């Protein structure tokens, strides 16, 4: 009787351990706390992923490196300099690219939209992106959207300190995995950051990742172009575009490059 009870107890213990291990395997565990994770396919069934994805090898690469397998969005198999050969460096660079892509998309919109509004009769102070911030050095200071009732800034140091604090909090929140370090993906956290549920379908989510990184790369090049335009022409992107349309021969990259004199 005692032997039967011991055997039953041992069997029950093994069953409980198996159930616990299965639960941990399904939902994950971090620092002694269980955290739910969305289950997704390892390689999405999309033309943009896998060995048969579209590739661009560039002029100096004969074949796709073995470490670029098409697992991640935006992988066209091009890495002539071998920047992604080390897995840790690759992971870090992917994170930096996605974050900078998002900032560039927001920045490009911020460079274009105020100038468009100004061209259509909306008055809110300086519309050219690289001139707007300089208003803080004027006697009247800087009014956000031209409205002194919103944010009236007169100290560049105060703006800098506020920026550091706010961005530090946001970046800490992201790197920490969400509120109280709940184990959210630092690049694609979902949840409250996806109120429309765009990532609920894994296949649609995989496609959106590709669209995001492609548009983000384009935005980074656009921002670089805006910087160069500001230095060379002293005008915003919309005004430069209007000048080019009005007189393409006199207003183009080649004409400005051949006539550009630094400091003038």
From Swiss-Prot:
Biological process annotations from GO: photosynthesis, light harvesting
Give residues annotated as binding chlorophyll b 5.
Answer: 163, 260
The positions annotated for binding chlorophyll a 1 are: 78, 84, 97, 217
**PTM sites of type Phosphothreonine:** 39
Q: Specify the superkingdom.
A: Eukaryota
The UniProt record gives the binding positions of chlorophyll a 2 as 100
Protein name per the record? Chlorophyll a-b binding protein of LHCII type I, chloroplastic
Q: Can you list the GO cellular component terms from the UniProt entry? A: chloroplast thylakoid membrane; photosystem I; photosystem II
User: Cofactor: bound how, per the entry note?
Assistant: Binds at least 14 chlorophylls (8 Chl-a and 6 Chl-b) and carotenoids such as lutein and neoxanthin.
Q: Where in the cell is it found?
A: Plastid, Chloroplast thylakoid membrane
**Ligand binding (chlorophyll a 3):** 135, 145, 212
| Post-translational modification note | Photoregulated by reversible phosphorylation of its threonine residues.
Q: Which residues bind chlorophyll a 5?
A: 211, 229
């Amino acid at each position: 009787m005692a032997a039967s009870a011991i055997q039953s107890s041992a069997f029950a213990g093994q069953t409980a351990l198996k159930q616990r291990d299965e639960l941990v395997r399904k939902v994950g565990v971090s620092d002694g706390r269980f955290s739910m994770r969305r289950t997704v396919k390892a390689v999405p069934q999309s033309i943009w992923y896998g060995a048969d994805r579209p590739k661009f090898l560039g002029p100096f690469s004969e074949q796709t490196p073995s470490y670029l397998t098409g697992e991640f969005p935006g992988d066209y198999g091009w890495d002539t300099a071998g920047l992604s050969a080390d897995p840790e460096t690759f992971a870090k660079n992917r994170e930096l690219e996605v974050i900078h892509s998002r900032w560039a998309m927001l920045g490009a919109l911020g460079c274009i939209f105020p100038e468009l509004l100004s061209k259509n009769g909306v008055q809110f102070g300086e519309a050219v992106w690289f001139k707007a911030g300089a208003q803080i050095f004027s006697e009247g200071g800087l009014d956000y959207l031209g409205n002194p009732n919103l944010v009236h800034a007169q100290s560049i140091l105060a703006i800098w300190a506020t920026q550091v604090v706010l961005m530090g909090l946001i970046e800490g929140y992201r790197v920490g995995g969400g509120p109280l370090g709940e184990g959210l993906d630092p690049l694609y956290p979902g949840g409250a950051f996806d109120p429309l549920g765009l990532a609920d379908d894994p296949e649609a989510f995989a496609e959106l990742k590709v669209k995001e990184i492609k548009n983000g790369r384009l935005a980074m090049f656009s921002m670089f172009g805006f910087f160069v335009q500001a230095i060379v022409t002293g005008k915003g992107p919309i005004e430069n575009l209007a000048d080019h349309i009005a007189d393409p021969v006199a207003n183009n990259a080649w004409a400005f490059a051949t006539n550009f004199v630094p400091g003038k």
